[in-house]
Amino acid sequence: MSTVSEQPTRRAQVPTDRGRRTQAAIDAAARTVIARKGILATTIADIAAEAGRSTASFYNYYDSKEAMVREWAVRFRDEANQRVLTVLRHGLSDRERAQQAASAHWHTYRNRLAEMISVSQLAMINGDFAQYWAEICAIPTSFITEMVRRAQAQGYCAGDDPELIATAIVAMFNQFCYLQLAGPAPGPAGAPDDQTCIDTLANIFYRALYYREVHPR
């Protein structure tokens, strides 16, 4: 089984400026359609129509929509790893680290919405993409697990499994981001802004780790 850390098989490098512009147009169109319909309902004809290109043009760059998403997954992994560095830097308080973790997850999801939707949906039907999704989720799960262990060293989350807590928090992050960024259209009040969403995630995350039970007298 291939993994996201392996470079996927791809066609020869696009040789001309025109070719690069065409591929960029196809990628942009695919992201637009996938964000709207999801990867499973998206066809190559949909992507070509959105890009204003022929279906044959798509196959000059990708063998299939799955091959396109594999290339995206590699690019996404590199960006996600860079965002993690903001959370791991020294000198942050526990509250600041929770805020940075929420911000990194939100902005990664917003900036790579089509990738997140594509890989998560294909993971339900394809073993390779299930592995890709597991690797993508492992990035935040790993550093949140370490945050839980640090909280336990301070007397919080006693008796809990750090990795299970981290897995639950990442699942919550993913579902929240999906619903806010790709879910049903917002009501009359409109969708919450970025900072409100980040603060909501950070508050839930921080309170989940740094709570103290109050026992009734």
Predicted regions and their residues:
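An amphipathic alpha-helix signature
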Residues: 99, 103, 138-149, 163-166, ...
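Hydrophobic alpha-helical connector segments
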Residues: 71, 82-114, 165-169, 198
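Helix-turn-helix
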Residues: 25, 33-67, 71
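Secondary-structure edge/capping motif, primarily at the C-terminal ends of alpha-helices
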Residues: 87-91, 116-123, 180-184
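N-terminal intrinsically disordered/low-complexity leader segments
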Residues: 1-21, 185, 213-217
